[in-house]
Amino acid sequence: MFDIHTVEIEWAGRPLKLETGKIARQADGAVMATYGETVVLATVVSAKSPKPGQDFFPLTVNYQEKTYAAGKIPGGYFKREGRPSEKETLVSRLIDRPIRPLFPEGYKNDTQVVVTVIQHDLENDPDILSMVATSAALTLSGVPFMGPIGGARVGYINGEYVLNPHLDEMDESSLDLVVAGTQEAVLMVESEAKELSEDVMLGAVMFGHRGFQPVIDAIIKLAEVAAKEPRDFQPEDHSALEAEMLSIAEGELRTAYKNTQKAERYAAVDAVKAKVKAHFFPEGVEPKYSAEVIGAVFKHLQAKIVRWNILDTKSRIDGRDLSTVRAIVSEVGVLPRTHGSSLFTRGETQAIVVATLGTGEDEQYVDSLTGMYKERFLLHYNFPPYSVGETGRMGSPGRREIGHGKLAWRAVRPMLPTAEQFPYTLRVVSEITESNGSSSMATVCGTSLALMDAGVPLAKPVAGIAMGLIKEDERFAVLSDILGDEDHLGDMDFKVAGTDGGITALQMDIKIEGITEEIMNVALNQAKGGRLHILGEMAKAISESRGQLGEFAPRIEVMNIPVDKIREVIGSGGKVIREIVEKTGAKINIEDDGTVKIASSSGKEIEAARKWIHSIVAEPEVGQIYEGTVVKTADFGAFVNFFGARDGLVHISQLASERVAKTQDVVKEGDKVWVKLLGFDERGKVRLSMKVVDQATGQELAAKKDDAAE
């Protein structure tokens, strides 16, 4: 019934198994991949023909984690997996980026990749395995795909590169780098690092590329016995059309792209496009080509013209040379009632970034396959349509916004103080108000400025820059701080963020083969120069964190209480802690280890809550004087509440220096009195004295010390 084919290899010390022919047989390609004991199912389905009028390649990648994979039931009211989590969205993008360039130009059939995590051993992250399984499924499917690709994670522990480190090893690693590519070339890099040099980062990329070669060999071996017949796809040849269009439009397009003003340049290009359309769609004559074909070829021609201009003249669309960064204006404190804010403008790219400080109860709970954890640093990136002068949908963030926000998050996180050093939850929101290239890197710069403005003690300021690379035969040009128009025409786009001491995040997408290690090294070092320049411009606004928090930011005081006292502070059903919060106005968060965080914008509220909690958990000291309230009187003395919920007896002989006949002659219930703790009797009962304390001042009466001790 089943025609099963399997290939197994040992990879980075663990078995990797790829199997096809048993599961999901109606998909064009399906592979069950196992690494250690983590299992994913990758499927590929591609329509047999494109939709009429389709002018782009509709590729969708859906990565999904099933909670049963880790023996869990979804949390929340509905016990079913819902909308994609942030990780699912990010891994979907991670798989998409290296496979998209390997589909032939002109292939426009609707294609969907679905990757499902069906078992997780809590040791091997499913993202790398998902990339490998997708590559195998595409290679077997018969869909035109110029793969296979491999992928690997690289760690850097104790000065050594580690291939596919276990999840628990990543805590010790100063690098988390994912690299994917073919046998000959690197196609994609995504990473977070703790201030590593360009050489170490590039070394990690090449180490990973070498590391996944056995995986590519295994996929090829499986394809030799299990691959379907390749589909007959011949991309349309538009070389004659392109040559004809070039003869009409080359001169005017070159002139248009010498215009350094974006709006004027766009108008000039539109005029050339109108001229081209008039040539190919004469009135009263049946056109030889469709509007979609003319549009696609014209777009291709635009890219060629810009590339030729840059390589020939070493001058960019906006008049800059290859390494110049656009003019930068950095401002902080632009929204004075917020906790921290900045406005970062680089050319026609601009971001308003706002930092908000919160308490422990503001932390984000994340329910992952590996377990529930709390995230104390949140970064949200918003890209409204007006930022590029367009109308569009507004609503929940798309994949691009989530991906850009995560890149900025990775860039800044290594410089944040620990929770012990700075016990605040941090939320940063980046509102992109203008965009013409590299809004994610503007977010990195703006986030660094806003956090420093808020008084967050960053180890160092962080800046980011977007780079491009154009290569024609042996000639190449590396572009610093690319424009939106330059973003898609390059052969390598990469974004580098870091401090003056090293790289904290690197994202790289390479679209062609032939980008050598030497070329990447040149590009990374040019990016370093740009990053240092941007850091210098940012320092004109603020160069280090403010010494104090903003006026409207909450203050947090941390105290530690014995673990066995936590129950007393919380009270039955939370009664005590609710009362403290209601009466003092402070927010209180108690950790399982006895760490108590008290937060309020008012120092008085914090102090009131701290004293209250201290009175509950602390033990009264013998010989100390306390203020108390008489709660009960008796013939033999008065009971005084003097230390939180603690009561003690003032014997009738200790009420006053003279002889007292009746307790009520000296005190009544509700009276405020000063008492000294004399000690405890043999049954542990508290012994108090009023007569040794001046009831007007609360000071001890020295002359009476000996009497009280009797």
From Swiss-Prot:
It comes from the Bacteria. The keyword Metal-binding applies. It is found in: Cytoplasm. Mg(2+) binds at residues 487, 493. Keywords: Cytoplasm, Magnesium, Metal-binding, Nucleotidyltransferase, RNA-binding, Transferase. GO terms for biological process: mRNA catabolic process; RNA processing. It catalyses: RNA(n+1) + phosphate = RNA(n) + a ribonucleoside 5'-diphosphate. It is an enzyme of class 2 (transferase). It holds the Pfam family PNPase. Its EC number is 2.7.7.8. One of its GO terms (molecular function) is magnesium ion binding. This is Polyribonucleotide nucleotidyltransferase. It comes from Rhizobium rhizogenes (strain K84 / ATCC BAA-868).
